[in-house]
């Protein structure tokens, strides 16, 4: 998640337009031998947890209920701006999720699950309430494709790291930390994204085509039947970047 967060910020999306949910405070975990740091790989070349990371929901706040309320706009009146998704019918939304999952579910905190039905109904409410124009949903988990199986709302693209019945694998273990630091699919996506700039013309089709099963050990799933444009005409920066536009009058 932090790798994707860094990427969209680099491409021009400010923290005011990003809502970051982190269930675990890995940077401050007493078992982390590098306090205050979360590395992108075992080579420790890039610290993803710098001074400019703004976590909007952390720890116990990361629940299925809070995610669904956030997406559908049903947050309490006292909720601060940083915990609200103030989108409208002109907004393009990128929704990225990762963690442990299975057939049509993703775990939250090892205590509850969000189902494919929950997600599909939330996105439909977003469409009915005019809370998005186009939506890109990316998920990296085991059997990721099943989380997109119940989607039925217009203008949605879904991409997952694995098909039904497949695992999604982690990348090389950092033996100093004792666990892998990133999943293979997300790593491959982020490697490609390093070549993308705010003014790049690369498309989602080019991004998806760059992902090979030999590198991820799983089969990428892409669903675009709900979308109204060919993927080779959709720029990556339509969802993961922002360029300020000035209208002269």
Predicted region positions:
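Cysteine endopeptidase catalytic domains of the caspase/legumain-like
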Residues: 1-249
């Amino acid at each position: 998640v932090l790798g994707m967060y860094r990427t969209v910020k680099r491409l021009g999306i400010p923290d005011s337009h990003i809502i970051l949910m982190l269930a675990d405070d890995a940077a401050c975990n007493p078992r982390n031998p590098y306090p205050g740091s979360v590395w992108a790989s075992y080579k420790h070349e890039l610290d993803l947890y710098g001074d400019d990371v703004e976590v909007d929901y952390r720890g116990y706040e990361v629940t299925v209920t809070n995610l669904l309320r956030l997406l559908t706009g049903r947050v309490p009146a006292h909720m601060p701006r940083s915990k609200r998704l103030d989108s409208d019918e002109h907004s393009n939304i990128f929704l990225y999720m990762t963690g442990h999952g299975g057939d049509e579910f993703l775990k939250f905190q090892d205590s509850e699950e969000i189902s494919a039905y929950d997600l599909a109904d939330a996105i439909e409410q977003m469409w009915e309430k005019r809370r998005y124009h186009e939506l890109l949903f990316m998920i990296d988990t085991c059997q990721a494709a099943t989380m997109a199986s119940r989607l039925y709302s217009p203008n949605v693209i879904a991409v997952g790291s694995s098909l039904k019945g497949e695992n999604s694998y982690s990348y090389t273990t950092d033996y100093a930390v004792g666990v892998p630091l990133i999943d293979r699919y997300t790593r491959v996506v982020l490697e490609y994204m390093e070549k993308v700039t705010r003014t790049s013309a690369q498309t989602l089709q080019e991004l998806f085509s760059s992902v090979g099963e030999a590198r991820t050990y799983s089969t990428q799933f892409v669903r675009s039947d709900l979308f109204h444009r060919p993927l080779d005409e959709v720029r990556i920066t339509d969802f993961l970047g922002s360029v300020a536009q000035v209208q002269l009058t």
